[in-house]
A protein has these predicted regions:
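P-loop NTPase catalytic phosphate-binding loop
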Residues: 1-91, 101-165, 169-172
Length: 172
């Protein structure tokens, strides 16, 4: 059962290996799909090849576009999200309102972002609110970039022993 929090759309999840971070991500996505939300993009990046394959199989056909790639290709997902944001911001500027379907991107234990990747990630995070996108990132040892906390509006810790998440929402 998915634990309900007051979640925003830039979510940083931490916990030790085996705590349930990947499970949390799947439950999070399922909570939207089970409520009948129209999801146009599901993107998933992970350094575990088995999890990438499992994600693709689990969600195939449940969104207009399902993309699951390994860590080396995380920049491809950032480029897709930036392209989608550009289109959505153009629509928002023309219509004045965002009515585009939800897009969800999960970066599960996908390593450290630096240089150009970091800049792209920051831009994605900064525009996610206005573009109806949810960005979910997990890590266990080192946050995905320096000062990561200031770019996320919800932080979740998954306890290793109980596998229960606890949440802190940051008001902006």
């Amino acid at each position: 059962m998915f634990v309900k929090f007051k979640l925003k759309n830039r979510i940083l999840v931490d916990g030790k290996e085996g705590s349930g971070k990947t499970w949390f991500c799947r439950e999070f996505i399922d909570s939207f799909l089970n409520k009948g939300w129209n999801v146009s993009l599901l993107a998933y990046v992970d350094y575990h090849e088995g999890d990438v394959v499992e994600f693709g199989e689990r969600y195939e056909g449940k969104a207009d576009l399902v993309v699951a790639v390994s860590d080396e290709k995380k920049e491809n997902i950032l480029d897709i999200l930036l392209s989608e944001q550009k289109q959505r911001l153009d629509i928002l500027n023309k219509r004045g309102v965002m009515r585009e379907p939800l897009q969800i991107a999960v970066f599960d234990e996908c390593g450290y972002f630096e240089g150009e990747q970091r800049e792209k990630l920051i831009k994605v995070l900064q525009n996610a609110d206005r573009c109806n996108q949810i960005i979910l990132m997990t890590y266990q040892h080192k946050p995905p970039m320096t000062e990561a906390g200031k770019y996320f509006n919800t932080k979740i810790h998954v306890d290793y022993l109980t596998h229960k998440p606890s949440s802190v929402t940051i008001d902006e």
